[in-house]
UniProtKB/Swiss-Prot annotation:
GO annotation (BP), single: glycolytic process
Molecular functions per Gene Ontology: ATP binding; D-glucose binding; glucokinase activity
Name of the protein this chain belongs to: Glucokinase
Key words, A-Z: ATP-binding, Cytoplasm, Glycolysis, Kinase, Nucleotide-binding, Transferase
Organism: Escherichia fergusonii (strain ATCC 35469 / DSM 13698 / CCUG 18766 / IAM 14443 / JCM 21226 / LMG 7866 / NBRC 102419 / NCTC 12128 / CDC 0568-73)
Reactions catalysed according to its record: D-glucose + ATP = D-glucose 6-phosphate + ADP + H(+)
Length: 321
């Protein structure tokens, strides 16, 4: 008889829940709930389990916020809870709450070739560190290493490192944004809101007044080639994504590959392919050759957060991935 665990991927807007086959890691019965419709994460979980008429004893939920102890307070939502209390209330034997990019990193060993699109570099080196990052509402970052037959995710808040300009134009953008918001992190330019910041700074640098555009508007106008400023913003976004990925590669020697997740890049895949992304990734001066062969992959799996939550839980329960 198949034994299932509950897995989840929870963001500021939606909570996506599914079942994970503990033996194989296969994800099934995924369903998305609006976080605004429920008073707590526990309430959503109860609804899901009732709807699917299933009993589970183990669970792993990935959440888009730092996880530093028993008390979890979501960054972009009002939900807050004690992990131990929720585990007790649900009657679970085991409940893991992990960072969303910890989950994405743990999905990488489970991905198949059809889930990946490669952007330059050679083959990944087995056993070497891996980096994963992705732009969405924010900028998530994690690393993954293989130690004693176990995958170990190294979570952090790498999206909040300083934005480091490397051209005159990027320097001007930094100054404009710094005057507006103070500290300018990488997330302030590599995210949905970050794309808007780039567009606004490009227009303001030319002493013009920017329109009140959303990320979707900027992307659509850039792809339609109907707005020079939007196209420049999207081009610069791709270049800065490359610089940032190259920095991750240098920091931990990620010869196991650099992986891009998040919902933004797949929306303009052909544009991204033709952009200055890879050139910027390798633009490391004296260390250009060091990063030259490091492969970059775009993750195109539908639910890497769910897949990785399942992988994390299965490994915790003693399975070898």
């Amino acid at each position: 008889m198949t034994k299932y665990a509950l897995v989840g991927d929870v963001g500021g807007t939606n909570a996506r829940l599914a079942l994970c086959d503990i033996a194989s890691g296969e994800i099934s019965q995924a369903k998305t709930y609006s976080g605004l419709d429920y008073p707590s994460l526990e309430a959503v979980i109860r609804v899901y389990l009732e709807e699917h008429n299933v009993e589970v004893q183990d669970g792993c939920i990935a959440i888009a916020c730092p996880i530093t102890g028993d008390w979890v307070a979501m960054t972009n939502h009002t939900w807050a809870f004690s992990i131990a209390e929720m585990k007790k209330n649900l009657g679970f034997s085991h409940l893991e709450i992990i960072n969303d990019f910890t989950a994405v990193s743990m999905a990488i060993p489970m991905l198949k070739k059809e889930h990946l699109i490669q952007f330059g570099g050679a083959e990944p080196v087995e056993g070497k560190p891996i980096a994963v990052y992705g732009a969405g509402t924010g900028l998530g970052v994690a690393h993954l290493v293989h130690v004693d037959k176990r995958w170990v995710s190294l979570p952090g808040e790498g999206g909040h490192v300083d934005f480091a300009p490397n051209s005159e134009e990027e320097g001007i953008i930094l100054e404009i944004l710094r005057a507006e918001i103070g500290h300018v992190s990488a997330e302030r330019v590599l995210s949905g809101p970050g794309l808007v910041n780039l567009y606004r700074a490009i227009v303001k640098a030319d002493n013009r007044l920017p329109e009140n555009l959303k990320p979707k508007d900027i992307t659509e106008r850039a792809l339609a080639d109907s707005c020079t400023d939007c196209r420049r913003a999207l081009s610069l976004f791709c270049v800065i994504m490359g610089r940032f990925g190259g920095n991750l590669a240098l920091t931990l020697g990620t010869f196991g590959g650099v992986y891009i997740a998040g919902g933004i890049v797949p929306r303009f895949l052909e544009f991204f392919k033709a952009s200055g992304f890879r050139a910027a990734f390798e633009d490391k001066g004296r260390f250009k050759e060091y990063v030259h062969d490091i492969p970059v992959y775009l993750i195109v799996h539908d639910n890497p957060g769910l897949l990785g939550s399942g992988a994390h839980l299965r490994q915790t329960l003693g399975h070898i991935l």
